[in-house]
Amino acid sequence: MACSLRVAGSSARLGLPEVKLGLIPGGGGTQRLPRLVGRGRALDIMLTGREVDAEEALRIGLVDRLVPAGTAVDAARELARELCAASSPAQRAVVKTVDAAYDRPLAEGLRYEAEQVNELFERGEAMEGLRAFLDKRAPQFA
């Protein structure tokens, strides 16, 4: 749960069974799960200790991509290759902007977003991306 993108195989089963052991989910489970799936669903999973199958995990937002059983590692590697092809500063700005403004008023989030766009133009990342698009070539990000 402590990552930006989550890939699971179709046979995956996920859960936080700690209550069945007299514990609570540690390692941030009580904080991350509600943020991913909502308070009610998170409490259902944590209070019962039940497992969620892959289809339900995708439906409720616990995972972002569902792939055939046995291919999750390969799919995650392919996703990593896709991520490596993009601008790292732009990706950091996306995550930073989403995290900073997620529960803020829309106007505040839009202002913060505009600041991040301006910073990317100042760094040159955005200009290289636009030039590459116009030149019909792959961008060469630093």
Residue ranges and their predicted role:
Residues R131-A142:
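Terminal low-complexity tails and localization/encapsulation signals of metabolic enzymes
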Residues M1-L47, R59-I60, A75-L79:
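CoA-thioester-processing core
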Residues V7-A12, A54, V63-R111, E115-G124, ...:
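C-terminal long alpha-helix characteristic of the crotonase
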Residues G29-R32, R41, A90-A93, E113-Q116, ...:
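Hydrophobic alpha-helical segments typical of transmembrane helices
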Residues L33, A57, V94, F133:
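Terminal peptide-recognition signature
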Residues G49-E56:
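Acidic, divalent-metal-coordinating active-site segment for phosphoryl/phosphodiester hydrolysis
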Residues S4, L23, R50, G61-L62, ...:
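Conserved functional loop/turn residues at catalytic and ligand-binding sites
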